[in-house]
């Protein structure tokens, strides 16, 4: 396998993994621990 193909596949997998983790953090179980700055600052 060529080096360029390996690097392309590696970067693609890394990007998909980071995106999946970000979505899980934003909408999954850990999202209950996130604070909402708009709720904290009510006028």
Curated annotation (Swiss-Prot):
Originating gene: psbN
Statement: the UniProt record of this protein carries the keyword Cytoplasm: no
UniProt main location, coarse: plastid
HAMAP family hit by this protein: PSII_PsbN
Membrane topology: Single-pass membrane protein
UniProt-listed PANTHER family: PROTEIN PSBN
Family affiliation: Belongs to the PsbN family.
Transmembrane segments: 5-27
Gene Ontology biological process: photosynthesis
Listed name of the protein: Protein PsbN
Cell compartment(s), UniProt: Plastid, Chloroplast thylakoid membrane
Pfam families: PsbN (PF02468)
Taxonomic classification: Eukaryota, Viridiplantae, Streptophyta, Charophyceae, Charales
Species, as recorded: Chara vulgaris (Common stonewort)
Entry GO terms, CC: chloroplast thylakoid membrane
